[in-house]
Curated annotation (Swiss-Prot):
Protein name: Transcription antitermination protein NusB
Record HAMAP family: NusB
Molecular function in Gene Ontology: RNA binding
Gene3D superfamilies, per database record: NusB-like
Keywords from the UniProt entry: RNA-binding, Transcription, Transcription antitermination, Transcription regulation
Amino acid sequence: MAPRQQPRRIARELALLSLSQIKGKAEKLDKVELNDLTLAAIRALTSEVQDTLETASAEVKRGHNQLFQYETKATTLESAKTMIKDALTLTQEAINRLANAIEFPEIIQLASQYEVREYAIELIGTINRRRKEIDEQLEAVLKDWQLKRLAKIDQDILRLAVAEILFLDVPEKVSINEAVELAKRYSDDDGYRFINGVLRRFTDHIKHN
């Protein structure tokens, strides 16, 4: 059985995964049901699983071809082993995403569905309405990076946190901690450290400006 979680934590995850698929003005968002959000989140996860497995498959093929063509070259053997290792890592990531997709409906059923839907819609609506302001705030604190060059999931985790802090009166510490947890679940190995660093700079920035 999936563990019981706080409604707002589930809502953040639901909003994160649904952002790319749920668009529209406030009046349209009001008509979006919890099932619509859940379906959008599961579609996003399964699409990511498919993309990750395709990448892993390509790495396996490349590694196999190198082994087949250059069996006696030590450097090529090492390169092929690295490709296979990378493919295994990607496959594990895909399995984790698939597990998330499978357990997500049960997690929502165990929570207060009204609270989950209301906060997820509030987050999505706030980001849609204030996207320009949110992105400008993030661009101001991204050192040697451009927001658009970050992984899409990292962009959206950052937007969620900034939206909460600037517009939804969520305490900075709470929002940053929740963003870090989302990054641990959905970003790459170093993603959560990067997210934490950017958001710390953001909170310092707004205090001094």
